[in-house]
């Protein structure tokens, strides 16, 4: 039976785990900066070498403190080690051996699985000298690399894969590039301001402590993708960094995190914007909703921390939401408590419904029949002496559903009539939780630009008709 080995990257913060992750997966999925503690959750990625496949797990650094966020970060790293077939223990060749390295090594030596000591940042220094002091850790397999420049990375992964038999091969004919897990699944991005409960919601939806949750704004720094299956359907949940107002973003790392959050939204198919019920919908929430609407993704709102609120406060939140979302009445709203699980189960049905609507399939004949039904009951308004004529329609794309309507003089259609068409198509197609876009294309007139030469008799008749109309 073939297998795809799982390789876990562990070590102190800022030793280059995310840089190596990006090298091994040939992506830039992991956020990288010269800043300790940047990665705080497990991040998965697939890679291949010579047609052989493997999965890499990036983890948060195992911290030296016993309190604060280092504790859950360490827990995430230990879970990754438990899932892995191979462990790559990374150390900093420039910083040398530290007490934290010794402590981590003592735990890894107890594991009944292959563990390799990877001495990173050996560029510009003598590799043998950099490696020498790390032999004291008692790990027999010691490999030097420079992840930032890619030196030694290929030979390292070749050596590691040699320890496996019956490796899974890339299917014949498939393009040999890295493929992210969950690429063929329903991709759901969870967005919101800092500390509104995004990670708690994802953990509740997954049923495990998968994403680090800490009662401090800005816990999630990178966009974390979690692939899994539910009732035979594949999903990828994407936890993102909280997006604050631009004036409150001071750290460069946080600016990168916001960019990654918006990129995650672009890569998703369904976006769930989480709002804090205690604060109601804020201007920043509306900005986030604006980003989501501009992206054209299926969209829903989860109003979190709903439990424990007074009835009059709940009513104020409902009224305010309805008033401020008048521009997008199709957006579905669910009131939940991520901490206690209230209403979270219903989100799955809403996600599936929104995805099905965003990727609707319909033939040209059926869509044209719908268009004729709409225009026969309510034809386009006359513009001067002429009326626009819609002839046929077809599906131009998905996520969002894009309907292309062909006809004559479509540029003369007023905005109000285009909005009417959008609402009627949404109603007939039963689209829920997704925007819809209409594109209008006018046919070319083969006689446009030619001078219309009339005979004397035609000129006389035309003058007579104009004179009669003036009476």
Swiss-Prot record:
What is the source species?
Answer: Alcanivorax borkumensis (strain ATCC 700651 / DSM 11573 / NCIMB 13689 / SK2)
Which sites bind GTP 1?
11-18, 58-62, 120-123
CDD domains with a match to the protein in the record: EngA1 (cd01894), EngA2 (cd01895)
Q: What is this protein called?
A: GTPase Der
Task: List the Gene Ontology MF annotations in alphabetical order.
Answer: GTP binding; ribosome binding
Q: How does it assemble?
A: Associates with the 50S ribosomal subunit.
Q: What does this protein do?
A: GTPase that plays an essential role in the late steps of ribosome biogenesis.
Asked whether the keyword Protein biosynthesis is assigned, the reply is no
The family classification in the record reads: Belongs to the TRAFAC class TrmE-Era-EngA-EngB-Septin-like GTPase superfamily. EngA (Der) GTPase family.
Keywords attached to this entry: GTP-binding, Nucleotide-binding, Repeat, Ribosome biogenesis
Q: Which Pfam families does the annotation name?
A: KH_dom-like (PF14714), MMR_HSR1 (PF01926)
Q: Which InterPro entries match?
A: G_ENGA, GTP-bd, GTPase_Der, KH_dom-like, KH_dom-like_a/b, P-loop_NTPase, Small_GTP-bd
Q: Which Gene3D superfamilies match?
A: 3.30.300.20, P-loop containing nucleotide triphosphate hydrolases
Question: What are the KH-like domain coordinates in residue numbering?
Answer: 360-444
GO BP annotations, alphabetical order: ribosome biogenesis
All copies of the EngA-type G domain together span 5-168, 186-359
Listed binding positions for GTP 2 are 192-199, 239-243, 304-307
